[in-house]
Amino acid sequence: MGSIAPQDAVAPSAAPAVAVNSPFRTRILNNQICPVMTLKFWTGNEAAFMARMAGFEAIFIDMEHSALNFQTIAQLILACLSVGVSPIVRSPSKSHWHISRILDAGAAAVVVPHVDSVEEVRELVKHAKYGPLGTRGSANNQPILGFRSLPTKVQNEVLNRETMLIPMVETPAAVELADEYLAVEGVDGILIGSNDLCTDLGIPGQYDNPIYQQAVEKVVLAGKKVGKPIGIGGIGGRLDLLERWFALGATWSLSGGDGAILQAGMKKITQNYEEISARVEKQKAMAK
């Protein structure tokens, strides 16, 4: 038999690159502004497709302020992953069982509300990260990695690095601890909860109040100092304030919820028809 010429030899295939496809993470780590749509009522997978068509690169699936069940959320996560939209899920609690299940379902980021101490932040890292950073239970065939079967060490390292743990800052005490939260290894950023923060400050809904604005500024600058992204929640309709925080260093915001978006669209339709009706009635009156 003839020998195989060197140029005909088949080189061993390189191991496939393993990475999380998260446009959200890519944008905010590159200091690019990222609007995020919130889901609380919409349960169909078409939400992810329509959001992508509209230009959103991330969806915030809210388990704290909704009746969405876990099976629905898991399907929404898969729909997001299938169209290249990052699924961000707000946990309903600080529980290990909620946080680990959200991540095992394929979330690119888990947001945890009502975090009140550095000790709680360290506990969250244990729940969200594999060893040596945390104690998250290891399961193979992760949805966010395309259900691939990977060496456990490789999978865990990638997910520790590229899935995000984001505690929320929603009280004056938490604002003062923002630097310490961000200093904890395994914390990937902060989301400011403007509604609860204003309420705790004794100024509910007063987003123009200097007390609220100074608190936001403190957290945004804390993130900028250490290179960890800061998001703003609760003021999606205040583009003037969002522009101010983005200029200061924030990179993402909760920019509109499914209910509000649907209501705004429906209201616009009815307003258009009311205007048409008024013009037609005026024309009829003039014709008499």
Each language-model region and where it sits:
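Expand to "…catalyze enediolate/carbanion chemistry for C-C bond making/breaking, isomerization
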Residues: 1-288
